[in-house]
């Protein structure tokens, strides 16, 4: 029943846990969190930067991500990728999301069944070998896995153009999700017209 505790009591509990685990515990705080939450974070930043920070920490054995689902999933993916597991002798780093109800409307714009349906429908009229799927980092791990299975790429807002250039060097078409606006605006900036960007 932590929800019934006052902030001072919560802070004391968190500090006790931090003292117990020392540098093995990394607490990440996303920019959007309240000041009281950020004050207890070891690192503050955007979702990708925070995930990279935790994954590169040689002492880290536990991650608490004070953010939303896709952020914790991204930290899990980066911290537990094969080369990191090998460095730690196969030991996985658990990632804790303190508020399991913390979601992101952007990440919720596309569910895996919708992406698979769209891909199948595209396959009825096009050769999907000529389509590179690109997902924005603000997406569920299942969408990132889909992209990986189909030879695609995960992008951030700062490297979306580079991701599209990489994709178009491989195939003549791109399937971009879940943020249609990031995809369209980036493509427009590359000289691709709106009539060349159908929406599903």
Regions from the PLM with identified roles:
Residues 1-200:
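Active-site loop-to-helix "anion-binding N-cap" substructures in soluble metabolic enzymes
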